[in-house]
A protein has these predicted regions:
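N-terminal capping/small domains of soluble enzymes
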Residues: 1-100
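Alpha/beta enzyme core
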Residues: 32-38, 42, 99-206
């Protein structure tokens, strides 16, 4: 057995410790990760809004008192560059209202990062922008995004909230569409749901 087969890897890179920093809008950026880089193996920065619809939603949410990022692709590139040379495997948590928005990001940064689709946010402006939990309720649209990113040859993660829909069905659909990672929020359901998802697909679970 090769040594690489005995250790966890994400996006083809070794994970030094199985602790991952999750995205928190307006909070988890490169500086946040650097301050904690000695203690984590991977990190997802963002969420970042990719198009007019999601940027408008983020602005509305910010005006309501939530923290949000306003970074465009150039600013995201700067964040990625700040983490060059670290041993933290990096992912971007992304919000887009169309498949094309995700593909544009993938063509900007290629396989330097993991692309995490935000199917998690339950704020109404983001749902109305056809993002976040909208994608859980409309899994055909979510799987279209996964397939498009997979076709670009990049590593695809989906951040989801357990218990919103049939988790086992969704896990199987995302696996078939080409997802590599499921990032599951168990806050509302408890840890027992993870076994159901694990038994439904062979994807890496966070």
């Amino acid at each position: 057995m090769h040594a690489s087969n005995r250790f966890l890897s994400l996006n083809g890179k070794p994970v030094k410790t199985p602790v991952v920093l999750a995205s928190m809008a307006g909070i988890t950026n490169a500086e946040y990760v650097l301050q904690r880089s000695s203690h984590v193996g991977a990190a997802f920065i963002g969420g970042y809004s990719l198009d007019d619809a999601t940027r408008s939603a983020a602005k509305e949410m910010k005006e309501a008192g939530r923290t949000e990022f306003e970074d465009d692709l150039d600013a995201i590139a700067t964040e990625i560059a700040m983490l060059d040379g670290t041993d933290v495997v990096l992912g971007l948590n992304l919000r887009g209202s169309t498949t094309d928005a995700y593909v544009a990001a993938a063509r900007e940064f290629w396989n330097s990062v993991i692309y995490e689709i935000d199917a998690h946010c339950r704020q109404q402006p983001m749902i109305e922008a056809h993002c976040g939990e909208y994608l859980l309720q409309n899994s055909d649209a979510l799987c279209d995004i996964v397939r498009a990113l997979h076709a670009e040859g990049v590593c695809v993660s989906v951040k989801m909230r357990a218990g919103v829909v049939d988790d086992r069905r969704l896990a199987r659909e995302l696996w078939a569409a080409g997802a590599d990672i499921l990032h599951v929020d168990l806050m509302d359901t408890g840890y027992t749901r993870i076994r159901q998802i694990r038994n439904s697909c062979p994807l890496i679970l966070i």
